[in-house]
């Protein structure tokens, strides 16, 4: 079991502890629960889905990397597939606050990058900030997404984001988590291919500046992240953050990164290269390459 879960596990009820401990045994537990694992936990505890998600929030919050604030926020995104995806906030020392990943963004991008096609609900241990409410409005589940907070009744996103501005106001039809393929030819070694594939499935309807990042670890594991734009622009999630989020959720640390590749267009309206390099160097990675899409 990864050390991050040890303290959180002791806060859970005894029956839940006993049921989930075997699932956490792998130090690289992927921070997600398959539908059958959720059913197993429900059977062991007698909890319904909503109550179980609340009970598991300490484990999601344990996935956070708030290296600046030391304020752990945890989220659990529930996919239409039945899978549950953990998420936690991330802050990067030596970079800028603009590179931060919020817990809701973490759980949602986790689900998206794992191939989930839509979300039913998200459970969070603190009220979503305005940034996250806007980020969630980019999803294909839209304002109907159910938000569950401790001590409150569940409400749809529209309750937390009245008079919402979103992609439909800009006549965008393809939404975040819809299937997308930008059709760039995939070639090169495994890491290069992963970066191009990530760019191919990115969500960039506003700038038309597709990009993807792939990270290779010292043990050969590869994590990739896709760019996710937002109608309000600022809540956009860069591709590097998607990849770093998966890396961290899977129990790895930044020093494990040995090589990184960014795939983007040379003539794109928005360029990720400088911000990607600056953040990776702040995390100790200097072996960074750029592959041009075309």
Curated annotation (Swiss-Prot):
Co-factor: note: Binds 1 zinc ion.
The keyword Cell membrane is annotated on this UniProt entry: no
Name of protein: Cytidine deaminase
Subunit record text: Homodimer.
GO molecular function: cytidine deaminase activity; identical protein binding; zinc ion binding
Cofactor needs: Zn(2+)
Underlying gene: cdd
Keywords: Hydrolase, Metal-binding, Zinc
GO biological process: cytidine deamination
This enzyme's EC code(s): 3.5.4.5
NCBIfam families tied to this protein: cyt_deam_dimer, PRK09027.1
Binding site for Zn(2+): 102, 129, 132
Reaction catalysed by this enzyme: cytidine + H2O + H(+) = uridine + NH4(+); 2'-deoxycytidine + H2O + H(+) = 2'-deoxyuridine + NH4(+)
Domain CMP/dCMP-type deaminase, chain residue ranges per copy: 48-168, 186-294
């Amino acid at each position: 079991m990864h050390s991050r879960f040890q303290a959180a596990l002791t806060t859970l009820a005894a029956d839940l502890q006993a049921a989930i401990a075997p699932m956490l045994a792998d130090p690289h537990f992927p921070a997600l629960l398959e539908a059958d694992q959720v059913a197993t936990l429900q059977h062991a505890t007698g909890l319904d889905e909503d109550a179980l998600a609340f009970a598991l929030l300490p484990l999601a919050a344990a996935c956070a990397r708030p290296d600046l604030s030391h304020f752990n926020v945890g989220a659990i995104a529930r996919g239409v597939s039945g899978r549950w995806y953990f998420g936690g906030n991330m802050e990067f020392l030596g970079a800028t606050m603009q590179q931060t990943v919020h817990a809701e963004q973490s759980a949602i991008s986790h689900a998206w990058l794992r191939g989930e096609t839509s979300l039913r609900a998200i459970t969070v241990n603190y009220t979503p900030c305005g940034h996250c409410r806007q980020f969630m409005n980019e999803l294909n589940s839209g304002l109907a997404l159910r938000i569950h907070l401790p001590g409150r009744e569940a409400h749809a996103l529209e309750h937390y984001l009245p008079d919402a501005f979103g992609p439909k106001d800009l006549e965008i039809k393809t939404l975040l988590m819809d299937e997308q393929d930008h059709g760039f030819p995939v070639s090169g070694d495994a890491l290069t291919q992963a970066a191009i594939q990530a760019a191919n499935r990115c969500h960039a309807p506003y700038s038309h500046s597709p990009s993807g990042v792939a990270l290779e670890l010292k043990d050969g594991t590869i994590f990739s992240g896709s760019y996710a734009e937002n109608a309000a622009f600022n809540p956009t999630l860069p591709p590097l953050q998607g990849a770093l989020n998966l890396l961290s959720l899977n129990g790895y640390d930044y020093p494990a990164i040995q090589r990184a590749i960014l795939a983007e267009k040379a003539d794109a309206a928005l360029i990720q290269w400088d911000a990607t390099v600056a953040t990776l160097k702040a995390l100790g990675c200097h072996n960074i390459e750029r592959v041009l899409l075309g």
